[in-house]
């Protein structure tokens, strides 16, 4: 019976210091759990061949130590706005990471020595000025830890916070990413971060932009923060060469897609493929209306697509 168990789903309060013996378990999902550090350690010790772990809205957990889980390769963590995730993660054997950061109590320390692929996003609905400053520090430290990751996916809220850091001229780490995916609407509030990410990814081969409504931070919150820092928002959101983009994501026009493609081509040297994949609600124009730019010294494949499966 135990040998046939490959996956367990549970939504409960896990008693402190629970003892389990799931010696054949390879995939574990824990959702809506009040999970202490001691309980998590006990569960992990009873799952010696665990390969995949998902923590979905697990409160109380502060330190997630996976250093003794030698077989663990995939880790997914999803907190919620009022249920923070762990603030310390030790996952030296994990190769694939999905991490959604809680805006109020984000993970500030993590070891992911052998990580090959990461997907990062921020769970936030209302941004205040204190969180804006705190999150900039958090996301930049995370990127620094992920310098050797070759496949990276960033969500719209994550890009917003990176844009604030770029406008303020905060240094960005260099990345070794070869395959970069951005899940965001195309509008002015993500342009500074996209431009800097491209410039700091000299080995980039493939860029995918999944145009979808995942940007939940309000534009006025971003503008208000910059004004308090002494910046003029109307001047901050342009690209380095002065190109202006749409202020509202749903008001995207063909020229804005063209401008984005031009920005990508100007800021990359090794890129082979660009794919811009639109959610079925965006855009309001036909993709044939987009003028696809070309550069004589670059041979880059550019594809504009609809309704691809979102992994």
PLM feature spans:
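Non-core capping and flanking segments associated with repeat-based/extracellular domains
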Residues: 1-311
């Amino acid at each position: 019976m135990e040998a046939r168990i490959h996956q367990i789903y549970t939504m409960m309060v896990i008693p402190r210091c629970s003892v389990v013996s799931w010696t054949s378990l390879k995939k574990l999902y824990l959702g809506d759990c009040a999970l202490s550090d001691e309980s998590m350690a006990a569960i992990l010790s009873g799952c010696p061949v665990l390969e995949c772990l998902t923590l979905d809205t697990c409160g109380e957990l502060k330190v997630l130590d996976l250093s003794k889980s030698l077989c663990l390769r995939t880790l997914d963590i999803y907190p919620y706005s009022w249920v923070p995730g762990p603030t310390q993660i030790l996952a030296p054997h994990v190769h694939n990471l999905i991490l959604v950061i809680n805006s109020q109590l984000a993970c500030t320390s993590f070891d992911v020595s052998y990580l090959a692929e990461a997907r990062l996003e921020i769970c936030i609905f209302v941004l205040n000025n204190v969180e804006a400053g705190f999150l900039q520090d958090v996301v930049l430290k995370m990127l620094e830890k992920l310098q050797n990751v070759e496949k990276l996916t960033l969500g719209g809220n994550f890009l917003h916070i990176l844009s604030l850091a770029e406008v303020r001229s905060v240094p960005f780490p260099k990345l070794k990413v070869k395959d970069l995916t951005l899940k965001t609407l195309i509008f002015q509030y993500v342009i500074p971060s996209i431009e800097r990410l491209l410039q700091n990814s000299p080995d980039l081969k493939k860029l995918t932009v999944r145009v979808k409504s995942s940007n939940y931070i309000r534009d006025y919150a971003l503008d208000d923060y910059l004004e308090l820092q002494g910046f003029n928002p109307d001047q901050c959101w342009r690209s380095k060469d002065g190109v202006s983009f749409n202020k509202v994501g749903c008001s995207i026009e063909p020229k804005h897609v063209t401008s984005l493609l031009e920005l990508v081509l100007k800021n990359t040297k090794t890129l082979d493929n660009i794919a811009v994949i639109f959610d079925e609600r965006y855009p309001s124009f036909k993709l044939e209306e987009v003028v696809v730019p070309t550069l004589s010294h670059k041979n880059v494949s550019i594809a504009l697509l609809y309704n691809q499966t979102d992994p």
